[in-house]
Every structure is written in C-alpha cells, then in structure tokens.
C-alpha cells in the first residue's frame, strides 16, 4: 500500500542517514524525520506503550503490532548482505574499510558544506595521498542536513590557504540583504561581506503558506 511504501522508504532513508553520520541503529529516532506513532514503536521515553527496558532494549505488549524501526533496519541490512544489494552509503563504507584510493594527483571537492561524516572519512583517507587538494563550500548554503550533512566539517577544516570570494553571482541586493539578516544570528558561521550581483530585486512575503501554495507561487513567479 502507499502507506507501507512511505514507511518503508523512511526506514531505508533512516538506515542510510545512520550510515552517513556513523551512528548506531539505536539512534534511529534522532533522524530528522517525523514518525507516525500509530505505525511505529517510538522510544520508551516518549511511548507509553513500552513496558520495560530502555532506548536500546525496550519490550512491547504482545498485541502491539506496530513496526520496530531498529529491528527493520537490521533486517534490511542483513537482506542487503545476503542478496548483494549495495547502496551509496555502503559503497562509501567499503571505500573507507578497504582504503581504496583513486589514481589521481589532484582532489577537488565542491559543495563541501554538504558532506557527511562518512564522506569526510573517505576524504581524510584520500587527501594525504594527493599532491594538491581544493575544497569549495559555503556554510550558509547547507541543503542536505536531512541526509546528515555537517557544515562544521567545512568550518573546522585546517587549510593552507583560505580564500573568501567577494561577489555573489546569483543574488541582487534586496534579496542578499534579507538573506544576511536571516543568517547573522547564527553563532558559528564564516563571516562574509558579499557584493550583490546587481542592485534591486524583489522580495515577497507570504504568510503561512501551505507547501502546494508555495510551489504554485514559485511556479507563477518563475
């Protein structure tokens, strides 16, 4: 059914998120998704149906037929191993475990703000074997946090030379001003003083839009 398919997709995505962030299956509830309490057994500290045990070994009434996410994740991973199914996170884990290196002298990584802990592990393995490494990123443009991206990996990276580009080739001045006001409250970020692409631009505020209203507005504007 559509409902079970949605739940299955979320569980697979959670398994991948745990791999990308190098976390244990027991941390499944920390994933940035919302779970339907009618279909999923929630952790004991938030689920009154849990009987005994803790976050790692809860027990449930015999008539509780809701899905156990950690059990399903373990079953999914076992299935992959038995049937030779390999996902992207699995490939990265194999690269890391086997110390597989590309036959290149220069390493270039774009959108570094969107890499995960697992990807960073591979990067750490590779960079020591390179003649030159270039990384590019903007901690104000993280869009894959839901996949486990960690902008601190960019902010804390030790580099020989740090170049901050002065110009935005995307945003006109009015939009850039709004963006700057929105991000200036973030305690840990790289300060930037960008020049706008051009003067002007239009900013439109829409109060409490639904997702479909937001999509329609973007489509109408574009």
Where are these regions (language model features)?
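Conserved helicase motor core of SF1/SF2 NTP-dependent helicases
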Residues: 106, 113-201, 212-216
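Acidic-and-aromatic substrate-binding clefts and catalytic sites of carbohydrate-active enzymes
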Residues: 209
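Conserved strand-helix element at the start of the C-terminal RecA-like helicase core
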Residues: 218-222
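Accessory N-terminal region flanking or inserted into the helicase ATPase core
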Residues: 2-108, 117-122, 135, 145
């Amino acid at each position: 059914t559509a409902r079970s398919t949605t739940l299955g997709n979320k569980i697979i995505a959670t398994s991948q998120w745990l791999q990308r962030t190098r976390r244990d299956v027991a941390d499944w509830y920390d994933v940035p998704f919302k779970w339907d309490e009618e279909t999923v057994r929630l952790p004991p500290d938030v689920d009154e149906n849990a009987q005994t045990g803790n976050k790692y070994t809860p027990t449930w009434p015999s008539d509780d037929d809701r899905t156990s996410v950690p059990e399903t994740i373990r079953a999914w991973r076992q299935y992959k191993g038995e049937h030779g199914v390999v996902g992207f996170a699995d490939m990265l884990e194999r690269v890391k475990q086997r110390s597989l290196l590309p036959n290149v002298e220069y390493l270039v990584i774009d959108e570094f703000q969107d890499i995960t802990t697992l990807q960073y592990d591979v990067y750490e393995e590779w960079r020591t074997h390179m003649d030159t490494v270039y990384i590019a990123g903007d901690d104000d443009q993280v869009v894959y946090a839901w996949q486990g991206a960690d902008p601190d990996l960019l902010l804390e990276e030790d580099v020989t030379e740090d170049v901050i580009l002065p110009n935005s080739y995307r945003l006109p001045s009015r939009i850039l001003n709004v963006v700057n006001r929105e991000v200036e409250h973030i305690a840990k970020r790289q300060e930037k003083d960008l020049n706008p692409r051009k003067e002007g631009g239009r900013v439109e505020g829409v109060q409490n839009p639904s997702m479909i209203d937001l999509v329609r507005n973007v489509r109408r504007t574009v």
